């Protein structure tokens, strides 16, 4: 592929779009952002082979470069991925290009927890190998990481819904990165470092279990997508349109009016966050 000057401009657009599309599903006890400085970066132990083999998009297209999650975090001066753990994953990836996971037996969770402030777990699925259910290995990895670290962020780099068992929901923060394109690693680094406030919203309802999806012919009728759950019920973890941010706001004077078929909703919204205004 021939390089052109416009590629850098396109990369900046791709990076901004990917960062703005990140959906923050959960964030408790200020797990995110990893608000470090250049002099005192936040030390993060990153787990999951998806940090190396980060899926970028659908098959049939090949971007001129791919920035994986580990590379993106490494380039961010306020975040410092654990060097030893990163070396283990890079070496394993060279020997196992098929994308198999690094065995947990070769890792000392307690040792990494003592040397780092936080942990990040990457769950990755490409469009060609999309399975919404976590493997037993992934569940075990989450249990061991959350058992050793008190501050854990879970990143989902997948085409869509992933079933989140209880151990996954125990993570302090959950980010749906999706298939974020060639700048995925840089975009995620912008979000977790606090340079960009996540503003993405879910375009679908996120149920508790995969079985909640009705296995029927996909027809664009009145009950398609999120309307199915609105009509027929089911346990929903995150509803259609859901997405958190780092800022805080207070709502008051909420009123709803109905005039024939016209519904009017009004409210007063006040920014209460200092660092990240809504």
Where is each model-derived feature located?
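C-terminal non-catalytic regions of proteins with extracellular/luminal or membrane-system context
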Residues: 1-278
């Amino acid at each position: 592929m021939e390089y052109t000057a416009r590629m850098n401009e396109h990369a900046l657009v791709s990076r901004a779009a990917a960062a703005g599309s990140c959906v923050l599903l959960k964030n408790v006890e200020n797990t995110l952002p990893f608000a470090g400085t250049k002099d005192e970066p936040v030390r993060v132990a990153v787990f999951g082979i998806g940090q190396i083999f980060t899926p970028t998009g659908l098959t049939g297209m090949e971007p001129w470069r791919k920035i994986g999650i580990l590379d993106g975090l490494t380039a961010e001066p306020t975040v410092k991925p654990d060097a030893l753990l990163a070396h283990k994953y890079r070496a394993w990836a060279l020997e196992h290009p098929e994308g198999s996971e690094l065995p947990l037996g070769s890792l000392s969770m307690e040792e990494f927890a003592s040397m780092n402030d936080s942990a990040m777990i990457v769950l990755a699925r490409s469009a060609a190998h999309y399975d919404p259910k976590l493997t037993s290995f992934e569940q075990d990895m989450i249990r061991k990481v959350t058992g050793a670290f008190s501050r854990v962020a879970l990143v989902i780099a997948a085409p869509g819904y992933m079933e989140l068992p209880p151990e996954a929901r125990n993570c302090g923060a959950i980010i749906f990165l999706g298939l974020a394109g060639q700048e995925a690693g840089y975009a995620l680094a912008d979000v977790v470092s606090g340079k960009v406030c996540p503003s993405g919203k879910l375009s679908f309802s996120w149920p508790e279990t995969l079985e909640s999806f009705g296995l029927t012919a996909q027809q664009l009728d009145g009950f398609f997508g999120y309307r199915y759950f609105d009509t027929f019920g089911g346990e929903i973890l995150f509803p259609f349109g859901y997405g958190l941010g780092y800022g805080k706001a207070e709502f008051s004077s909420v009123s709803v009016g109905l005039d024939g078929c016209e519904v009017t909703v009004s409210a007063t919204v006040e920014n209460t966050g200092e660092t990240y205004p809504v």
